[in-house]
């Protein structure tokens, strides 16, 4: 089966499930459209990169987001992971680097937004609700952008939502390193759904 068929099935499973929203922080009424507004209670944002291909992988914590450019166009697949939604400057810069519309960044920051998938000319945008297991279960707002050779993920909270996918990349087992960004997108969605539902 093609990756597109598999992705469609994963998304179908998502929307058959009950939808649960995390805590909400929306812009004030009358705010200019497309102007991101984060919650003062949100975790500070931190950028991470995992870049990989059949020959290996590299992980990097970004002190400066411009460091992402060292990986894009060099590695077959680049996964940009922004953890925490509290640093608007970081979120906006990632949006600028990857030509993400500011209205979509507003959806990234709206933790009450319902799950959805939208198809654009150069990318797919998905919002999904994940879950963090600890002393008690916590819902998490996750936004994923699939672009050519790049997947950008915004996570509301620090945690281990994608620990299994990371381990598969590190170990080089299965299909992960031999497939493109569309397979990474599918694997991320699949892990969220398996953990949350």
Model-derived segments and spans:
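Peripheral, non-transmembrane regulatory/ligand-interaction domains of membrane transport proteins
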Residues: 1-197
């Amino acid at each position: 089966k093609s990756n597109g068929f598999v992705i469609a099935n994963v998304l179908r499973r998502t929307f058959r499930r009950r939808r649960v929203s995390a805590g909400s922080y929306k812009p004030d009424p009358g705010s200019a459209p497309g102007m991101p507004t984060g919650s003062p209670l949100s975790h500070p944002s931190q950028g991470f990169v995992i870049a990989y291909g059949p020959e290996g992988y590299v992980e990097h914590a970004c002190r400066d987001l411009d460091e992402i450019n060292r990986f894009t166009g060099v590695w077959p697949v680049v996964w940009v992971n922004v953890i925490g939604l509290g640093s608007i400057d970081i979120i906006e810069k990632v949006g600028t680097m990857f030509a993400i519309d500011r209205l979509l960044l507003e959806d990234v920051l709206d933790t009450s937004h319902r799950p959805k998938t939208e198809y654009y000319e150069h990318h797919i945008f998905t919002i999904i609700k994940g879950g963090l297991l600890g002393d008690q279960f916590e819902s998490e707002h996750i936004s994923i952008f699939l672009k050519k050779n790049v997947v950008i993920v915004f996570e509301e909270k620090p945690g281990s939502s994608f620990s299994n996918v990371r381990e598969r990349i590190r170990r080089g087992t299965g299909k992960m390193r031999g497939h493109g960004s569309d397979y990474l997108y599918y694997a991320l969605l699949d892990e969220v759904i398996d953990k949350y539902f």
